[in-house]
Amino acid sequence: MAIDYSKEIETVNSITYEEFQENFYKPQIPVKIKNLLSDSRANAKWSPKFFKRHLSDLEVGVFDNNPELLDRSQKTAPHTMRFGDYIDMIEEKPTDARLHLFNVFKHMPDLVKDFEYPDIADRILKSLPFAFIGGEGSVARLHRDMDNSNVFLTEFWGRKKVVLFSP
């Protein structure tokens, strides 16, 4: 059965706690919230150039879409490289290389001061903030989050295509 990619996800510019809970969280309907962090310092300063300037020499694990590994879960990256080289690579040309479950806050703890967690949901898990960084052509394989979490996927630069499906 083919996946129908034509269903649009509702987009709002802002939303209250009550609106989010009643219209999206409780019925488990995805929503794009355009301005949730628009006033944050993170939105103003986080960019590939910013992270390269601060983390250029950091060795990072890099995942790809090796066809021999597509049928199994990968918890350890098959490649490593300097973060600065990775940023250069994804800005230069399309690539399937990506950083997955990269805890940038471990290396730059003060980044948590650049944003506030949204007040539209209860019990936001603040101890596991991860960055998913990839350039044009990178793909996160079909997966279910291991903790069955509801997540806030926040895009700071670039574009992302996301396919959601109900279990």
Which sequence ranges carry the predicted segments?
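N-terminal accessory scaffold of Fe(II)-dependent oxygenases
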Residues: M1-P167
